[in-house]
């Protein structure tokens, strides 16, 4: 069977061809971590992947957004699908041709099998329970979580590294239980500012580095004289347990 489908991806494709060639897509039971410094583009990358997975490929996808509301996620997704900059959507300064693009994009987003849960301060146990329901009732094939640092554990007084370890092990176990890929976003430490991130710089790095099957970093070379002017982002596959 693998021989006959040797030119196809065996997992859920991300829509990024070079990444998919390396990973053959996100595989069932894999725990994938996407890490970056704040404001580098973790959520934007995840939304780009979800656009390809759910909107373009019609693969059922779950998204736990612990940082942004359903409305903000909807606006950003609509901007991506319509290819209309977000500032134009927010300001209302649109041209006549934009309205047809918006209408088409809204229809595609509405019909996409993308299930967004935007409950803030969501407990780990609740995420696990909701994920099970999404798979059982909606046939979800992949889940994204934004982001690890906002998941609430049972013992909030425990040291941060212990809480991250509990979350990491639980999400890895959940991916195996549900037999789907789970993609969790994570911040990296301030040490990575201006440099390419390393596995040791993931928040709570020991457990996440051990539990994750794939770790992908986003890196942008910010110009020193203007921190808001950025170059293209680079995706770094720092770990691939089942890769070559």
PLM regions with names:
Residues 1-21:
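N-terminal pre-Walker A segment at the start of P-loop NTPase domains
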Residues 7-8, 86-96, 114-121, 152-165, ...:
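Flexible beta-alpha connector loops of hexameric P-loop NTPases
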Residues 21, 52-139, 153:
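Cytosolic-facing regulatory segments adjacent to core modules
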Residues 27-32, 59:
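Pre-Walker A (Motif I) flank of P-loop NTPase domains
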Residues 35-36:
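The Walker A (P-loop) glycine that initiates the GxxxxGKT/S ATP-binding motif of P-loop NTPases
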Residues 39:
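Walker A (P-loop) phosphate-binding loop of P-loop NTPases
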Residues 42-43:
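Conserved lysine of the Walker
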Residues 162-244:
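Phosphate-binding/switch region of NTP-binding enzymes
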């Amino acid at each position: 069977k693998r021989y006959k489908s040797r030119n196809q991806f065996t997992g859920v494709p991300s829509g990024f061809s070079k990444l998919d060639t390396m990973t053959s897509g996100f595989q069932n039971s894999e725990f994938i971590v996407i890490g970056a410094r704040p404001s580098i583009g973790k959520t934007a990358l995840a939304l780009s992947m979800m656009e390809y997975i759910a909107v373009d490929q019609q693969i059922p996808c779950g998204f736990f957004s612990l940082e942004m509301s359903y409305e903000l996620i909807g606006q950003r997704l609509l901007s991506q699908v319509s290819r209309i900059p977000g500032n134009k959507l927010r300001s209302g300064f649109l041209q006549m041709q934009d309205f047809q693009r918006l209408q088409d994009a809204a229809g595609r987003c509405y019909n996409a099998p993308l299930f967004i849960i935007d409950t803030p301060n969501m407990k780990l146990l609740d995420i696990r329970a909701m994920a099970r329901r999404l798979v059982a009732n909606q046939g979800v094939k992949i889940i994204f979580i934004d982001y690890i640092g906002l998941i609430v554990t049972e013992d909030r007084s425990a040291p941060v590294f212990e809480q991250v370890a509990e979350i990491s092990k639980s999400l890895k176990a959940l991916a195996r239980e549900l037999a789907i890929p789970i993609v969790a976003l994570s911040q990296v430490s301030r040490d990575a500012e201006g440099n390419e991130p390393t596995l040791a710089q993931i928040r709570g790095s020991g457990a996440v580095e051990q539990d994750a099957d794939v770790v992908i970093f986003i890196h942008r070379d910010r110009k020193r004289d203007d921190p808001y002017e950025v170059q293209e982002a680079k995706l770094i596959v720092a770990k691939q347990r089942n890769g070559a």
